[in-house]
Amino acid sequence: MNLAYIPSPTFSKFEIGPFTIHMYAICILIGICVAVWILATRWKRYGGTFDQILDTTLVTVPCALVGARLYHCITTPADYFPPTGNLVNILKVWEGGMAIFGGISVGTLVAFLWCRHKHYPFAIFADAIAPALPVAQAIGRLGNWFNQELYGWPTTLPWGLKLNDADAIGKSEICYSGAQCPDYRTTLFHPTFLYEMIWNLIGAALIIYLGHKLADRLKAGQQFAMYLMWYGLGRTWIENVRINYSTVILGLRTNVWTAIIVFVLGCILFVVLYQYGPDPKAQARGLAAVTADELERQSIEEEQLRQKKQTNRTK
């Protein structure tokens, strides 16, 4: 008998009038809000404004969420594509299924294109968001706890996760290995959502600490490379603890391969930027100049609008 364990929530949604609110969505939204706050705080230190971050967020986040959903559906096709799945299930995001690797890939691409369009230095934008991303991911992982999903192998450790939903066993009662899972009522499972939360928060703290400690030595973009290395390394071992179904390629789960690629790309990016990366101070001066131009244009537009309104009143 297990005397100590982590209990699972007894609910994953609630009703407000005719609307159903899913805790999974709330966790993601809170994570996004906290990440935007961290990003904006760091961005303003480089000479930017909150409005710049707000505009970038409104463009990037929806695309990142679509990328996260599509990556999940593509890497677990049995539930979403014929002959075993239903395409309509792709739209059922409230049931869970958002893969961060897809979100990172699409979100990074869209953010790069937007920064290029607005003439913002992307390298320091990437550095500004580097610790914000793992914090957002840590908060979002609580959604997996509410959904009772993405847990790990059975364990007897005192921090094992106790499930209270029969359907929570991989949502199919079949373990990833193909064997029948133990009885959820008497078995504890590794809380991989918690492992990743802790890993991400440690990573965010390290990025902030090293970014401050090595401020005179780091090139612009290297803090983002740290994030890629840290998260790729963490997902490599955490993914191997999970028992949810995943496509296997050459003996490794798809997400393990992706995590390895992300880690390697982070290492390469860190080394390349160390040799050839831009100077953060020069990038900050460039951002300050762009910001000054934006504020001047806004001031001119506001003055023109004020004069136009005043003219209309006198007619």
Curated annotation (Swiss-Prot):
GO terms for biological process: lipoprotein biosynthetic process. It comes from the Bacteria. Pathway: Protein modification; lipoprotein biosynthesis (diacylglyceryl transfer). GO terms for cellular component: plasma membrane. Pfam families: LGT. InterPro entries: Lgt (IPR001640). It is found in: Cell membrane. Its EC number is 2.5.1.145. It is a multi-pass membrane protein. HAMAP family: Lgt. Belongs to the Lgt family. NCBIfam families: lgt (TIGR00544). This is Phosphatidylglycerol--prolipoprotein diacylglyceryl transferase. It comes from Bifidobacterium longum (strain NCC 2705). The lineage of its organism: Bacteria, Bacillati, Actinomycetota, Actinomycetes, Bifidobacteriales. The gene is lgt.
